[in-house]
Amino acid sequence: IETFAEGFLLTRDSMEWFRGQYLPDSERWHDPAASPLYADVTGVAPALVFTGGFDPLRDEGRAYAAKLAEAGVPVVDRCFDDQIHGFYNIAITRSSVAASDEINHTVGAALRGDLAW
């Protein structure tokens, strides 16, 4: 993780700490049971993938969405270019509130069955 690894709330050091808490055995970091990026996603449920443009995890999220699409899984892949990691939970700017509203609308449409995948 190089892009946006510092200065945008979530840092490389904090992500490494979280990964160590989640999966201390580095031999398992690419285990399909630990990360869907390494799993067969054929036939999984439709997915909504929302990322922030300044999120160090953006590329990972977008790669997952692409993997789903390549497997024929219905997916909405939406990157909010001007947002950081956690923007949905800390919606304190006009743009983050607007992004959160769009997410809420999309999730609601998906739950109602009104989303055009």
Tell me the role of every PLM-derived stretch:
Residues 1-117:
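Alpha/beta-hydrolase superfamily serine-hydrolase fold, recognizing
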